[in-house]
Amino acid sequence: MRLPMLGEETRAELGGKAAPLAVLRRAGFPVPAGFSVPLSEFERHLAACRAPCASGTEIRDRLVAQGADATLRADLADALDALPGGRDTPVAVRSSATTEDSPETAGAGLHETILGVRGPDAMAEAVMRCWVSWWSPRRLDAPPRTGEEDADGMAVLVQVLVDADAAGVLFTGERRVLEAVHGLGESLVGGAVTPDAWELEDTGVRDHRPGSQDLRAVRRGDRVLREPLPAALRDRAPLGEDRVLEIDALGRRVEEHLGGPVDLEWAVDAAGVHLLQARPLTAVLPEPSDEGSDGDGAGTVLHGVGASGGTATGPVRVLRSVAELSRVRPGDVLLARGTDPAWTPLFPLIAAVVTETGGMLSHAAIVAREVGIPAVLAVPEAMERLEVGAEVRVDGERGTVAVIEPRSPARGPGRAPGDG
């Protein structure tokens, strides 16, 4: 079969990530050229791996052993040849599961994205990685959805990679916020840096909050690396105001075309603005508060970006790596430099999340909004200024973390309740 170019497919074959982009590309929006590996290809390869009573893990392992067949490999080569620049053009390969980027859930980081893929062999491997991520630990641990499992699956979206000078996200709706970083957007989504942010209104920019970025993600050959941000860029915003307003206007057109508020991932290179992802907003952004932050009688009050609304109180639990996840107890306030998809299973357990870096599109922010817990991100030196075990109040509307009660000496230095 010929793999359909982006814009030709039906929604049932596309999955949640690719479907809105196909709609936008057909309508003339600046969506990078690409193609999809439709759901039917996933199902065709899966059919040879199924066996009576086989578990998801067993099916996954059989799929890996089988690999992409000769027919799919040939189709991938033909589809790459049809792209601008031909088969050696660097592309982004993204999962497009039927269960992600819906109005109910974004599925942040649940499945694979591989950037800088070049050539048919690397493409076949990347498609397999996306397919295998259908059995990610988070999904296998989740309860099955009655009546839907057989209809679900994994398509794959392939697009020409934009070697971005700047990238970010725009949230449309009643509150419009644009966030941007230098380089590829991977550093923003991964929460590795704190982006510049612009609050927008009908008359233009209402407020600009400078970010904190000491590294950027760039493509080097077929790899995406994080490199130190050049000194000349460290005091320079990723975007000028004219470009901010251009992206805002584009976002309003997308919102009107798709029929509702979206969060819109975009990238800018020498050719202009490119739309990389458009998904329905799964939760309302907290409104910025102009109220004073006196902590309601509390002691130390730290300030950051309110990324998920609500208020919660609990003991501070500091985690410095994913290897420490087992230390978390229900009701803890998670404190980390940043989080990534491997941390996702913690979020239903914790009362709130606080990070030193990140923005509205970072993993911690998206998952916190979906789970419904407060999140305050980009809190400078939070891991040094908050004691392990101290009782704190996290206010996701105000963007504050207030110490209510310092750590009890009985808990010992560096220990919180439940550390044993």
Task: Map each language-model feature to its residues.
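N-terminal beta-alpha lobe that positions the nucleotide/phosphoryl donor
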Residues: 1-157, 164-166, 234-242, 255, ...
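Short acidic-glycine loop/turn motifs at beta-strand connectors
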Residues: 119, 172-175, 200-204, 220-223, ...
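Conserved catalytic alpha/beta cores of large enzymes that bind or transform nucleotide phosphates
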Residues: 180-261
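Acidic, glycine-rich flexible loop/linker segments
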Residues: 188, 280-285, 311-332, 337-420
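Catalytic phosphate/nucleotide-handling subdomain of diverse soluble enzymes
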Residues: 193-198, 287, 292, 297, ...
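Conserved metal-phosphate-binding beta-hairpin within the catalytic cores
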Residues: 256-282
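Long, charge-dense accessory insertions within large macromolecular proteins
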Residues: 274-319
